[in-house]
């Protein structure tokens, strides 16, 4: 009898265990479905490689601004996955002094330009066969890195022959070559330098050698090409210049610096250091001698690679670093077994790990239609709190035991998932374009609730006479704007004509000076001949009187 009772108890305990196990599995399954909206599944391997957002170099205020800017881009469908990069967004924000509306317009223009120009495939599609001739008439190239790991770009402007350059290629083709080099810098050079320096790098150091710069280097066509390239750089690749050294700046450069400077952004000009012929100490403060070419006072010659400007020396030539640069999945941080267990034992992946290039959140429930899912994702992206860093989580309490944490975490996630679906199902817009209206209405309701005791004050009506006056003023302002705009265009053309006339006058003066110098040399030769003849006559005369 006791054995029968014991068997019944064991059987009852077994059924309870089975039920608990079933409940546990359902909770875990529901938790996983919910967490799939925020995390990226990983394989448990010995190396435990998972994607970690490298945002340590972004301070707190900038990070909040970038996150807010990112949500603005998401709501306006202006964030393709390949451009979902916090550092890239930060560069655009800095270029517009953290004005989100101006930065958004700049971002939108950049996306349109990339589509019109075919930038995404320009590395594969465009071949610049005339590169050797172009480099012969326009010496330039990347050579090494500075002491902080940034690539160093060098141009010897005094050796540019603008006429031969535009005979070797066209403005349009050189413009495509310029864009291709920028794309290679962002896809290969910057990632390689980041891997070598173990920190994020998206800026470069530039050296412009202006020794011998004169009128022959920058004719009207060369200035037009320069203006087009600067517009591309400022509009589509902002904040990529860390600092610039202009060395060997002489009188010829000072003559041309004023018209060139007006094409540059004021913030860009603040990064430019104009140096004379004693530039070596300043360069060596920023660049190690082993990374600096010999003609700038460094130790590198690159004799076996055709010279420093042809060598393309840098970390991007390292096969291992190049592999990391070309393989986005290899640019992941490696975490320890302890960190991996922290994730396994109930901590949400969205609280610890974040992909380098964020993907849009996936579905919350599989039976929700695809056209509503994107709207849910965007709405939830706005409501999610900032993700704490891994170091912050390490300082917290130790996680619970594995079995308890899975069960508790799974049940909580399951319940929260159901609550979220019930709440969102009432507020999800029918179209993606309604998301902005939805968020605006939510903000209005919250503002209204925060000030329940204040009476609503309606705006005063506008009379017809006031409306007519306003329209007249707007018309006057438009006329003034058009007048000022036409004047500025005329003034720019007038300045260009004056500059061209001044350059032509300088050429004429140089020619006249050369002719005068030639005549002076001939006169001096004749004078020396006359003096020699007189000396000869005097010598004969003295000999005659002696006898």
Curated annotation (Swiss-Prot):
CDD domains: SEC14
A GO cellular component annotation in the UniProt record: plasma membrane
Cross-referenced PROSITE patterns: CRAL_TRIO
Domain CRAL-TRIO per the UniProt entry, residue ranges: 130-304
Record's keyword terms, sorted: Cell membrane, Coiled coil, Golgi apparatus, Membrane, Protein transport, Transport
Membrane topology: Peripheral membrane protein
GO biological process, one term: protein transport
Tree of life domain: Eukaryota
Compartments it resides in: Golgi apparatus membrane; Cell membrane
This protein's record includes keyword Cytoplasm: no
Coiled-coil ranges (or none): 464-526
Family per record: Belongs to the SFH family.
Function per UniProt: Required for transport of secretory proteins from the Golgi complex. Catalyzes the transfer of phosphatidylinositol and phosphatidylcholine between membranes in vitro.
Entries under PANTHER family matching the protein: CRAL-TRIO DOMAIN-CONTAINING PROTEIN YKL091C-RELATED (PTHR45657), PHOSPHATIDYLINOSITOL_PHOSPHATIDYLCHOLINE TRANSFER PROTEIN SFH1-RELATED (PTHR45657:SF39)
Protein name, as recorded: Phosphatidylinositol/phosphatidylcholine transfer protein SFH7
Species in which this protein is naturally found: Arabidopsis thaliana (Mouse-ear cress)
